[in-house]
Curated annotation (Swiss-Prot):
Its main location: cytoplasm. It is an enzyme of class 1 (oxidoreductase). Pathway: Amino-acid biosynthesis; L-proline biosynthesis; L-glutamate 5-semialdehyde from L-glutamate: step 2/2. It comes from the Bacteria. Belongs to the gamma-glutamyl phosphate reductase family. One of its GO terms (cellular component) is cytoplasm. It catalyses: L-glutamate 5-semialdehyde + phosphate + NADP(+) = L-glutamyl 5-phosphate + NADPH + H(+). This is Gamma-glutamyl phosphate reductase. One of its GO terms (molecular function) is glutamate-5-semialdehyde dehydrogenase activity. GO terms for biological process: L-proline biosynthetic process. The gene is proA. Catalyzes the NADPH-dependent reduction of L-glutamate 5-phosphate into L-glutamate 5-semialdehyde and phosphate. The product spontaneously undergoes cyclization to form 1-pyrroline-5-carboxylate. It is found in: Cytoplasm. It comes from Listeria welshimeri serovar 6b (strain ATCC 35897 / DSM 20650 / CCUG 15529 / CIP 8149 / NCTC 11857 / SLCC 5334 / V8).
Length: 415
């Protein structure tokens, strides 16, 4: 019996316990965990430093090292995030609908945990806590597999989580970490159908594609974000510039940042120079098609791969289009079904865009950066789903549940 199968058995047993836990019990445990994270700050920083040293020895880019790094302030933020989950409504046990049928049976539909969730993710140690608390709040056991670059941080965080949950009366195996970061073990996890009810990958395109190609466990794809801003001929110029700068430059390394600008040909000559001036402050590299380069003399020539790329950097691809239909076709060809935006004061054009663009979130006159659980107003999320089953868009607590029918009768039999 492999170590992973042992974890699967333990997780299945823990999930039965978690499914019966009350909201009060879960919230009390989360409050204790929030305090325990602060109490163990010194240990967490010490273990995190091992990952940082190893990353520097490998000459890892500074942006990636920053994602790995824990600080006192970041641990406080993680602790506060745990407290925020306490304030969120527990969806477990919620009756979503109830009715009586012709046989006078009372039929209710209620929310229940998914069971055991597997999560495969990359660098950021905070995901270890985020994923743990969201699954825990919804009564799900979880098995985590983080990246090798954050293994010491993840092990330290997992130790705090497990000890804290145990002190609160919950099984240590409610939350587990796979410490073997080999590809072989990752692939074994992807095929753990006997124990995992769903697998959620969080990371770059390569990780997600590997999971989709190898998993036999049902997968919820938290896809990459090749997001577009389309500036229509009826756009308000300054609004469009402000939205583009926010969508591209506020946090370029996240999946809801804009990667491509599509601009209507009738406003390109006026808009593009003003846009270029606004982006200069951030040293954004522009990669433009032939028509855009006739206006933007310093822009690099865009290649076919640029239309497909999630840059996660200060790089913007630019294409001039003849119509909203051309913009929609480009988005549906190259987009990743994440977040797409149109800037237009024409109601009919906005409606056509949102009806025809295939994406989890479609914006009219707003930045794509709002595709986020907290920004949308429903709290923490486990990722942004770009598929249509079982969830789509930011996955909050509700999306980590399934449903069950409860039927009340008084002796009815079916004729």
């Amino acid at each position: 019996m492999t170590e992973l199968i042992k974890k699967g058995i333990a997780a299945r047993e823990a999930s039965s316990f978690l499914a019966q836990a009350t909201t009060k019990q879960k919230n009390t445990a989360l409050i204790n965990l929030s305090n325990d994270l602060i109490a163990n700050t010194a240990t967490l920083l010490k273990e995190n430093e091992k990952d940082i040293i190893r990353a520097k020895e490998k000459k890892t880019p500074d942006t990636m090292i920053d994602r790995l790094r824990l600080t006192e302030e970041r641990i406080k933020e993680i602790s506060e995030a745990v407290k925020q989950v306490v304030t969120l409504k527990d969806p477990i046990g919620e009756v979503t609908t109830m009715w009586k049928n012709e046989a006078e049976l009372t039929i209710g539909k209620i929310r229940v945990p998914l069971g055991v969730i597997g999560i495969i993710y990359e660098s950021r140690p905070n995901v270890t806590v985020d994923a743990s608390i969201l699954c825990f709040k919804t009564g799900n056991a979880v098995i985590l597999r983080g990246g090798s670059d954050a293994i010491d941080s993840n092990k330290a965080l997992m130790n705090v989580i497990q000890e804290s949950l145990e002190k609160s009366g919950f099984p240590r195996t409610s939350v587990q970490l796979i410490e073997d970061t080999s590809r072989e073990t990752a692939r074994e996890m992807m095929r753990l159908n006997r124990f995992l009810d769903v697998l959620i990958p969080r990371g770059g395109a390569k990780l997600i594609q590997t999971v989709l190609e190898n998993a036999t466990v049902p997968v919820i794809e938290t896809g990459t974000g090749n997001c577009h801003i389309y500036v229509d001929k009826a756009a308000e110029k300054q609004m469009a510039i402000d939205i583009l700068v926010n969508a591209k430059c506020s946090r370029p390394s996240v999946c809801n940042s804009a990667e491509t600008l599509l601009i209507h040909e009738s406003v390109a000559e006026d808009f593009l120079p003003a846009m270029e001036m606004a982006l200069k402050e951030y040293n954004v590299e522009l990669r433009a098609d032939k028509r855009a380069r006739e206006i933007l003399k310093d822009a690099k020539a865009a290649t076919e791969s640029d239309w497909e790329e999630e840059f996660l950097d200060f790089i913007l691809a630019i294409k001039v289009v003849d119509s909203v239909e051309e913009a929609i076709n480009h988005i549906n060809k190259y987009g990743t079904k994440h977040s797409e935006a149109i800037i237009s004061n024409d109601y009919a054009t906005g409606q056509a865009f949102h009806q025809k663009v295939d994406a989890a979130a479609v914006y009219i006159n707003a930045s794509t950066r709002f595709t986020d659980g907290f920004a949308m107003g429903f709290g923490a999320e486990i990722g942004i789903s770009t598929q249509k089953l079982h969830a789509r868009g930011p996955m909050g607590l509700t999306e980590l549940t399934s449903t069950k029918y409860i039927i009340f009768g008084d002796g009815q039999i079916r004729n």
